[in-house]
């Protein structure tokens, strides 16, 4: 880049700002556009598909209109860039007061990153948009996460082995981490597994003492004990997260919710592999369709949808809380008409959680306040409807909804019903709410009549009946006369000559224009002042309105779970502090949709805590394993479950080792990943955990695999004593583990008919003697010759005393079978 003195004052100012925010694309405000220069312009031009031009002779340049900048900023952020927004902080007139040649002052007012978005247009309404932070002190890790658009703020202490599941559960848009931690091999593997923007800082940024000062400063307390009981590593994570938010908002932080500690004992910990294998939020291929959330999310509000996802990410581990939710779901199942009325009222309910955040950040628009007024009106209607019920759950929600009629009345009196997204032009405040505004409105309303009177006067004066008075942004008001006429009156001053017309002005027209423009300007300023006062009043009530928003979201979730229960014939499970796990005629909540699903029982209660399932591939072993884990998850969020009867003792952790998860990018083979995941289960499971293991020990030599599988089953049975379902293709395993007192054996029922194998997907007691692998190979499209060859080898192996004693088997005969 050339020497700075070679550039214009504007470009020198741009370069000085760019040096401060080198990691960001700098959007530099010039009038009604945001401009980008140099390499930033090249990047933005390609990313946004906008024209790349030049300023001067060789400076790359492109720009986007100010009024539509949000969408462009969103596209840049989604493409992985951070965006520094540079605004003019004074007018050209104010700059000239300092000096005739003074450059307008500009400052970066905000840095836009994936985790700090608050604008609706840049966010997915039904998805939580978390900014997360991981800090580290010794062997403890602090995980803090915030949704800036709603104010949600949580933290918890964790261990290295739990970080994968923590990030998987949260799915943050952006993760803040130290340079040192980022470079650790163990952390590098975790980060590669998740798709989110990574922002790293040096180690001192995460210093716990520094973080404590930030926390105390933001919340106005002298000690963090005033906020709650936090571990040092939690303080580090929270304070560092807040400091980063303060940096991106350029010091402008509204009143934020206190960080709440998520105690590990308060929710069911679902490990990372289980979150992926159970497909709670997306399928293995990344699609939402086919996931559990896609099946049960019948919510009718964005807030409810986000709350339901939080329920699934953090299933409750307290049977009293679970039973309270179940009571509410059962109430709505039994009161269908009320349920439908409530859902009708809240359908399309404005996303006031995010609106309130924009109010607190002073980034709300007239449209936001109009939507807030509509929401308060719906809350009033909702309160009136549910007040007829005396049910304890409804009474609690009614209290949370509160009474906002005074604020609703104020909004109705002040705001006009329009969808203005910017405030500078006015036109959104009811003139009747302010005497001066009403007077200014009359002046503006009368301006058309006054202009018309002046036009008629000038037509009479000049004798030109086609004379017009028009206006544009360049000239303001002007008199236009056809070129075929000559105006001789000296009061008419020529302003512009065109091919077919001449434009004039007069002192009288200038005076009238000044009155109109002055009224418009004063009116816009006054509207902005009134709007600011209204927003300040709303900000004072944000906490109460926030409670109402949460109550609406909760109503949405509870009525949704009731609707799903009725539509899909779910039953209320018994959830208590026992170690029971008994499911009668359970079904897979996702697979059963649109199919004739075969229901099966599962009993892992005390004395029968482990089930070992054998059977061929495609018989339904993996589906059975997953369905019972999903039933457990549903039970722990307070939902009814797909079964005829269910009794589940509270689970502390759910572990899953199901399906291949080979990840070449991580440098691990399928078998290595399987062993790592199995080791985590054996080390972390407890007697209150639920473990599902599918085909443990495959991917290595038979003796190795069988030994590993037997050792894993023995460890779970004797040491962790977890409730467990294991599926295996080792037919020796049931015989070798038959002496375990708490194990039972099942297989999937198969029938052979006319030489074909029929999978009945029915679980029955017993041990499968065959795998039917050759039949599955045929279904998969094996060439006929290869299939016949496989049958030949199998017959030879069956003739041997033991299928691993193959030295005496002649496999050379019949090799020349060809496909037909």
Swiss-Prot record:
It comes from Anaplasma phagocytophilum (strain HZ). Coiled coil: none annotated. This is DNA mismatch repair protein MutS. NCBIfam families: mutS1, PRK05399.1. The keyword DNA-binding applies. GO terms for biological process: mismatch repair. One of its GO terms (cellular component) is cytosol. This protein is involved in the repair of mismatches in DNA. It is possible that it carries out the mismatch recognition step. This protein has a weak ATPase activity. Keywords: ATP-binding, DNA damage, DNA repair, DNA-binding, Nucleotide-binding. It holds the Pfam family MutS_II. Belongs to the DNA mismatch repair MutS family. The keyword Transferase does not apply. The gene is mutS. GO terms for molecular function: ATP binding; ATP-dependent DNA damage sensor activity; damaged DNA binding; mismatched DNA binding. It comes from the Bacteria. ATP binds at residues 615-622.
């Amino acid at each position: 880049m050339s020497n700075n003195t070679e550039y214009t004052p504007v470009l020198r100012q741009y370069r000085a700002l760019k040096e401060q925010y080198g990691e960001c694309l700098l959007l530099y405000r010039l009038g009604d556009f945001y401009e980008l220069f140099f390499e930033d312009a090249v990047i933005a031009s390609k990313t946004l598909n906008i024209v790349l031009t030049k300023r001067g002779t060789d400076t790359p340049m492109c720009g986007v209109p100010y009024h539509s900048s949000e969408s462009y900023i969103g596209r840049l952020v989604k493409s992985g860039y951070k965006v520094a927004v540079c605004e003019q902080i004074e007018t050209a007139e104010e700059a000239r007061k300092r000096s005739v040649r003074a450059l307008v002052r500009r400052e970066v007012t905000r840095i836009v990153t994936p985790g700090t978005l608050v604008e609706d247009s840049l966010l997915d309404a039904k998805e939580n948009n978390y900014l997360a932070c991981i800090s580290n002190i010794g062997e403890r890790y602090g995980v803090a996460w915030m949704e800036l658009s709603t104010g949600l703020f949580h933290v918890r202490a964790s261990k290295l082995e739990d970080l994968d599941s923590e990030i998987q559960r949260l799915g943050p848009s952006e993760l803040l981490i130290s340079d040192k931690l980022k470079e650790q091999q163990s952390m590098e593997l975790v980060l590669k597994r998740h798709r989110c923007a990574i922002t790293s800082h040096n180690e001192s940024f995460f210093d716990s003492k520094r973080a404590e000062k930030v926390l105390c400063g933001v919340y106005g307390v002298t000690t963090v004990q005033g906020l709650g009981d936090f571990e040092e590593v939690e303080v580090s994570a929270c304070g560092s997260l807040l400091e980063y938010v303060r940096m991106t908002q350029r010091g402008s932080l509204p009143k934020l919710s206190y960080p709440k500690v998520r105690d590990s004992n308060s929710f069911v910990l679902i490990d990372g592999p289980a979150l992926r294998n159970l497909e709670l939020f997306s399928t293995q291929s990344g699609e939402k369709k086919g996931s559990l959330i896609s099946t049960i999310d019948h919510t009718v509000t964005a807030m409810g949808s986000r709350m339901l996802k939080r329920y699934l990410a953090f299933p409750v581990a307290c049977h009293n809380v679970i039973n309270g939710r179940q009571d509410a779901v059962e109430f709505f199942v039994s009161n269908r008409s009320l349920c439908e009325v409530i859902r009708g009222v809240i359908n399309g309910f404005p996303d006031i959680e995010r609106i309130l955040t924009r109010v607190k950040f002073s980034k709300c628009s007239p449209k936001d306040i109009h939507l807030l007024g509509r929401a308060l009106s719906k809350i009033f209607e909702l309160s009136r409807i549910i007040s007829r019920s005396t049910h304890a759950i409804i009474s609690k929600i009614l209290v949370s909804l509160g009474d906002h009629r005074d604020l609703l009345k104020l909004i109705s009196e002040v705001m006009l019903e329009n969808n203005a997204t910017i405030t500078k032009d006015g036109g959104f405040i009811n003139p009747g709410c302010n005497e001066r505004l009403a007077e200014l409105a009359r002046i503006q309303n009368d301006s058309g009549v006054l202009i018309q009177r002046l036009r008629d006067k000038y037509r009479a004066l000049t004798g030109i009946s086609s004379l017009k008075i028009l206006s544009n942004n360049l000239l303001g008001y002007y008199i236009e006369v056809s070129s075929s006429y000559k105006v001789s009156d000296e009061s008419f001053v020529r302003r512009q000559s065109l091919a077919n017309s001449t434009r004039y002005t007069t002192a009288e027209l200038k005076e009238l224009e000044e009155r109109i423009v002055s009224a418009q300007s004063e009116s816009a300023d006054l509207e902005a002042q009134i709007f600011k006062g209204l927003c300040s009043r709303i900000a004072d009530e944000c906490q109460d309105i926030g409670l109402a928003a949460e109550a609406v979201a909760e109503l949405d979730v509870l009525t949704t779970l009731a609707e799903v229960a009725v539509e899909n014939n779910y039953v209320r499970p018994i959830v208590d502090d026992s170690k029971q796990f008994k499911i009668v005629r359970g079904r897979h909540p996702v697979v059963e949709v649109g199919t004739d699903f075969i229901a099966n029982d599962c009993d892992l209660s005390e004395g029968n805590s482990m089930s070992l399932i054998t059977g061929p591939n495609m018989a339904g072993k993996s589906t059975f394993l997953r369905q019972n884990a999903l039933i457990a998850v549903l039970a722990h969020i307070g939902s009814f479950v797909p079964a005829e009867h269910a009794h589940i003792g509270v689970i502390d952790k759910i572990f899953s080792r199901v399906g291949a998860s080979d990840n070449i990018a991580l440098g691990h083979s399928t078998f290595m990943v399987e062993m790592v995941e199995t080791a985590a289960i054996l080390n972390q499971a407890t007697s209150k955990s639920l473990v599902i293991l599918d085909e443990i020990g495959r991917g290595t030599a038979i003796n190795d695999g069988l030994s590993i599988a037997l050792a894993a089953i023995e460890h779970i049975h004797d040491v962790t004593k977890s409730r467990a379902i294991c599926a295996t293709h080792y037919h020796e395993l049931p015989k070798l583990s038959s002496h375990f007192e708490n194990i039972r054996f099942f297989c999937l029922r198969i029938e052979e008919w006319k030489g074909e194998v029929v999978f009945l997907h029915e679980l029955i007691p017993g041990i499968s003697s065959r795998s039917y692998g050759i039949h599955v190979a045929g279904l998969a499209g094996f060439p006929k010759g290869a299939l016949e060859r496989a049958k030949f080898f199998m017959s030879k192996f069956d003739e041997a005393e033991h299928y691993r004693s193959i030295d005496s088997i002649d496999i050379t005969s019949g090799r020349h079978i060809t496909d037909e």
